[in-house]
Amino acid sequence: MAKTERWGNIDCNVNTCALTGAAAFFGGIPKAEIIANGPLWCYFYALRYLEKADPKIERRFQGTQPDNTAVVYGTEDCLLETLTKLKENSKPSVLLIENSCSVSLIGDDIAGIARKAALPFPTVCFDSGGLIGGFSEGYKLAAK
């Protein structure tokens, strides 16, 4: 019997969610930072995909990791905590704050939360969960 080659590190799914597409667009901007406002799963799913193009993207890509209560009642506290740390430790050329599917459903005003944080750098905010489409739709949304 012939030896079979294994391709275990190959991801055959080429259409990830819109959150990943938007993060990929901003990941291509020098010194841009990205915050995925959503569950840890969404962050790691996108991170795994983005690492293929930029193995050091985790330095510029963060997740808020809201708990179950926040996903129901709002992620403002989680997002403000992440934004405060970012403001103290970094100076990005631009910041993307994007909501995942679950957080998009509760209707948090992430642009309002970003204004409350008084960030000293340009900030772009939008919902980019998979409910709006796949990778391509997220990339197009980010490019607007």
Residues covered by each model-derived region:
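An N-terminal assembly and electron-transfer interface module characteristic of large anaerobic redox
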Residues: M1-K144
